[in-house]
């Protein structure tokens, strides 16, 4: 029986893995290393991987003449100009995936891999458009994406599967917080997770694509060429040009020097005939020490550490309380980064993966092999008028796979239509398993729907439709039945849980409505209040001054005022003594309107 594969499509390197019949992870790599994510076009010929990287003549990520380095970075682009040829990211990525699949097919001697179906990993910050583009490119390359999985989540599951008994390890970490991050060539991706009843549940995600190792390689190359120029007293005008194709060779040596300095104090970078000159001036011969390397990368490393601190601060988690910090990616092998991580998390919690360039791909392959499902980690909530919360999609809801979608519909009513707008505010709890009314929330965003301002409160119905598609994008659409002007928003920053062990569903714990107690701590600020409710009889959600107007207009349909509504109404009444609006001690009569 053939197995679905896991694909790690990375900015710098990419890899396909599969789980063999013996229960072992097999990687279809390039002589022990992942395939460089590089595509080169020479006429009608498409060259990918190491051969394309070795022909690079320019530095950087993106389109470099007739070569695309890191096509993943182009997922948000409409079109790209590759040496005069107008192409789309879909075309370039499809060409590269075809190369990966063909190489894996040639290496799959035992015919164990179903290379047409895959679990594909994505960065935590990849938006909806990027996911759609990636799925289309995979399909054009003959690969059906069964589901997308965040890269750190796949890495964590790969780590657990490497342990002698996965279930025992999950049981040990049950109820504990785990941080996993992938600090590779292109990005730094972080995921804070909690192990809950055998499932790996995401608490908070964060990503940064400006602190990857590729930027460090470029910085090392600049340092080396600058040192060579100083060595021979070159100025900007007298500096010799580099020979064609030599920059790619030097960047490879800089990358290797970075790896070597993880275990040694110094290394030599030697490359003959780099410059168009004679004798020693033409050859690069520079010694690079670990101390120098650390000074070169100090700013970039500090930015990465700041990203970790920001995520933990936002989640209100002390790094010393983490049960495990799993660090993957090539950058974490640098001694200076190891030391900073050890100081922050402690020796017992920190685990630096020895297979940092393979663990994400292997984790995706294990997810495919074990037929794991993704579920919603936190409830998707709608804020109602008076700050109550309506759970639209419950936590633990199974998320769609290829060709599937889930849809929820809800009828709502506008409690205050005077400005012609119904405001939908979508929220989620900040922490998993903490969805009580007083627990802190994080906003997804808001959706504003045009309504008829002349309608009485709670009369015009608004139909809200929430859909999650197989790209794990949430689509919120709403339309008022009188104005019939549709409004829509998309949210891609959902948090997932990887359901390793299915827990019994206790439906008694699921509550359709929660009362939110507004947290008034912190600085005073302006905020938008929702003005919708799903209950047509919730007259307590109507603003007091508006309810007074309604009662005066519809004498035989009057509704009783609550204490809160009465206070609201009073605030908008002028002083009985001087006629002033809301103001304390506004006149000599002693009348107080506040």
Residue ranges and their predicted role:
Residues 1-72, 81, 108-571, 575-581, ...:
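Oxyanion-binding/catalytic loops of NTP- or PPi-dependent enzymes
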Residues 84:
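Conserved glycine-centered beta->alpha loop in an early N-terminal alpha/beta scaffold
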Residues 90-106, 307-308:
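Short, acidic loop-to-helix structural element flanking the phosphoryl-transfer center
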